[in-house]
Amino acid sequence: MSEEKKDNPYGTPSTTGPEQPGESQERTNRIVRTLLRVPGLSKLVGKRLMTLHVVGRKTGRTFDIPVAYTKHGSVLLIGTALRPWVKNLAPGTPLTITRGGRPEQFDPLVHTAEAEVMRLFEVIARDNKQNACYNGIGFDAAGNPNKADIYQAWQQGGAVIELRPL
């Protein structure tokens, strides 16, 4: 993320930026976590959703975090803000996820550099317009993700998590 705010080189954003988690976010996450645990139903509900099982660095406690993802070649991509749980992800430390009711292990890499966030958020936005909207990314008349919006998401703490299979 940028240390200092600078003008958006891509022009004026079409949104105000990523949605801030509201008070209902934890309630929504609880419901989604439950639905993703139900055999059979998890494949329907979780077509673009999975649960990350993030282990706290200091507490050792496991946090189950439902997230939207995009499959990109052999990796999975997650567009998010730098939430506190993201700090617990480190390359070389396996991350367990549950997708389609099955646990899997991945090696996480958190991208925060402008160029990588811009490139990967565009991939995510093209694949999942609802996730793009949540991250404050609009689309131009031709249906392309708005680069000014992606830049704004990065400026406001946007990051992309790349999960590589183990």
Across the structure, where does each feature detected by a protein language model lie?
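Extreme N-terminal tail/first-helix region
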Residues: 2-42
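Short, structured beta-strand-loop surface elements
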Residues: 3-16, 73, 81-166
